[in-house]
């Protein structure tokens, strides 16, 4: 077995005198005994670390909610508005189509499962009007420009909701 021989640490002089061990409880030299405390001890380091951590957390929360939060909210509002205002004019509910006995519904078909429910969604025309293009442009610029784009988003929403549009 190999032992690592390291030099023993030398005893340091303590600036605060420590009473001798032979004294009883309550007996002493008259001065209180305090442990050595450095100016950058664990308490100051922990306090500084906590303050810096809280500051960084506050800056991160402020950055997230001041930029990304409103931008994502505007994007959600623009999508919902566009969907509500430009849904198909026909049926909004899916139509049901039942299969006849001779038709197969596909994988997973078992005995007695001859009827299946197929959903057909309404078709939307592929043409984009000038109003739709302006709405998408103004509402798309809003989140990109963050706080400066808020008036553009509101202008796009007002233009879309205006009766003459």
UniProtKB/Swiss-Prot annotation:
Subcellular location: Membrane
Family matches, as PANTHER family: MCG9903, RIKEN CDNA 1700020A23 GENE
Gene name tied to this protein: C20orf141
Transmembrane segments: 135-155
InterPro entries listed in its UniProt record: C20orf141-like
A GO term from the CC aspect: membrane
Region feature Disordered, mapped onto this chain: 1-36
Pfam short name (any one): DUF5562
Transmembrane helix listed as a keyword: yes
Topological category with respect to the lipid bilayer: Single-pass membrane protein
Stated name of the protein: Uncharacterized protein C20orf141
Entry keyword set: Membrane, Transmembrane, Transmembrane helix
Organism: Homo sapiens (Human)
